[in-house]
Structures are given as C-alpha cells and as structure tokens.
C-alpha cells in the first residue's frame, strides 16, 4: 500500500518511519511511504507556502497553489483518496482504519498554522479525518498515526495476523490484561489460569477480563457489541450479561 504524505516539515516524519514495524513493512514491500515536501511546489524564491488571511485575523493560512500542484503531481502516479487531517473531519476509529486499509493508496495532507485555503479543500480533498477533539500544531503526528494504524492491518505486516484480530477495537472491547515474567512482582501474582496450559480456560478468562475492563473503563463501547451464544453463556455465569443488556437498552 502506498502512503503519500504532504507536509512542509518532512523531517518530522522521517525518524518514526525508520524504526520498528513500519521500517520492516517498508523493507518487505508491504507499504511504501512517499513524503512530499510542499515547499518544492512553491513558485517564489523563498518557497513560501503560507500567507496572511483575507479579512484579517491572527496567524497565517496555507496557500492553495503549492498544495494543488503537489496533489496534481501525485495524481500522475497514484494519489488514491486525498485526505485532509483536520479537527473538522469525521472521527478516526479502528473501523475507518480498516476502511482505508482496503485502498491501494491514500494521500494525507498535513495542515499547519491557522488552516488551509478553503478553495484547495473544495477542489482536491476527498475526505477529512480528525483524530479527536484536540488541537495539534500540525497534521504530521496525525498522519503518522494513520500510517501506523492502517499498516498494521495489512497482511504480513505484524508477522502474526492473529494479533490484528485480537486487538482492542477489532471488536468493541478493550484488550484483556497482559502478564509476563516474573510470575510474582512486588507481591502480585500472575492469575493461575494463565499458567494452567488449558487453552480454552485461558481464552474464556481473557474474554471475561476484556468485557469487565470495557464495562468499567469504556462502557459506551459495549452498546455496539454483539455476542455469540457461547459468549452469552459465559457472561451469564459471571453475572455480566444482564448488566450489558441494561446498558444496550439505555438508548
């Protein structure tokens, strides 16, 4: 999958892409990241990509021309869906990541300053995405999060596709507690069931622990979750089923 990232600060993106899973994914050919410096498309000798807003006001606005030229250039190759990372976009979730993972390529536009000339958005943007109700100094960190979250869904990137299936938010459940060596840490022991070797018992324990964690920390997620017959039986055994049904009936 190809990720095109438009930015005026390409160095902000390079280091995270050269470490860990994202580096391996690029080396294996699972993903390709094309960082595009918007300044290269500026028309003046100072490579200016921003100007004062019409109507006055504080700050600067990113100019439409360099952005449009950059997108036009990418479209000659493979731009895919052009996405503007902005607080006004639709909320980014695991479902959106899975949706984007179906694309062969996407282009992420990183805004800066007070925003981007609206005319560029009207003519060139296909989608707008927001990571949440907070403000960043630019879209670069958001772009990296999108690249990371989409890449790990792609076949072979994690090396274990089951890791993707069992991730938090692959269902509307938080992940169960995790433990590793030593068996006892500051008086706290690893639950016995995890040392039993009984795979079904371990799976059941983790499922219940996941539901309990979600119920206490993010109960709203359970309103959308659907359980199969066996899971419902387990929930009833642990006095959780009626609580979840009551939660789902609130709306």
Curated annotation (Swiss-Prot):
One Gene Ontology biological process: tRNA N1-guanine methylation
Localization terms from the record: Cytoplasm
Domain of life assignment: Bacteria
Entry EC no(s): 2.1.1.228
Residues annotated for S-adenosyl-L-methionine binding in this entry: 111, 131-136
CDD domains noted in UniProt: TrmD-like (cd18080)
SUPFAM superfamilies found in the cross-reference section: alpha/beta knot
Catalysis performed (reactions): guanosine(37) in tRNA + S-adenosyl-L-methionine = N(1)-methylguanosine(37) in tRNA + S-adenosyl-L-homocysteine + H(+)
GO MF terms held by the record: tRNA (guanine(37)-N1)-methyltransferase activity
Keyword line: Cytoplasm, Methyltransferase, S-adenosyl-L-methionine, Transferase, tRNA processing
Annotated NCBIfam families: PRK00026.1 (NF000648), trmD (TIGR00088)
Subunit structure: Homodimer.
Similarity annotation: Belongs to the RNA methyltransferase TrmD family.
HAMAP family named among the record's database cross-references: TrmD
Function comment: Specifically methylates guanosine-37 in various tRNAs.
Protein name: tRNA (guanine-N(1)-)-methyltransferase
Protein's organism: Desulfotalea psychrophila (strain LSv54 / DSM 12343)
């Amino acid at each position: 999958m190809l990720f095109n990232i438009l930015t005026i600060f390409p160095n902000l993106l390079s280091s995270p892409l050269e470490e860990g899973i994202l580096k391996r994914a690029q080396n294996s050919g699972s993903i390709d990241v094309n960082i595009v410096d918007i300044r290269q498309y500026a028309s003046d000798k100072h490579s200016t990509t921003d100007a004062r807003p019409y109507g006055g006001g504080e700050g600067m606005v990113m100019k439409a021309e360099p952005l449009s030229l950059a997108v036009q250039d990418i479209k000659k190759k493979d731009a895919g869906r052009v996405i503007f990372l902005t607080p006004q976009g639709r909320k980014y979730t695991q479902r959106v990541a899975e949706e984007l993972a179906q694309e062969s390529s996407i282009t992420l536009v990183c805004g800066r300053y007070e925003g981007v000339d609206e005319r560029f958005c009207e003519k060139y943007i296909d989608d707008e995405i927001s990571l949440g109700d907070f403000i960043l100094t630019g879209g670069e960190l958001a772009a990296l999060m999108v690249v990371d979250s989409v890449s790990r869904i792609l076949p072979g990137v994690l090396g274990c596709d089951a890791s993707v299936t069992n991730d938090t938010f692959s269902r509307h459940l938080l992940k169960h507690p995790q433990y590793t060596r030593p068996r006892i840490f500051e008086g706290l022991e690893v639950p016995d069931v995890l040392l039993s070797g009984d795979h079904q018992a371990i799976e059941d324990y983790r499922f219940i622990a996941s539901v309990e964690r979600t119920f206490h920390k993010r109960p709203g997620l359970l309103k959308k979750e659907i359980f199969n017959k066996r899971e419902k039986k387990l929930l009833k055994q642990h006095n959780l089923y009626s609580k979840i049904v009551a939660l789902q009936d609130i709306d």
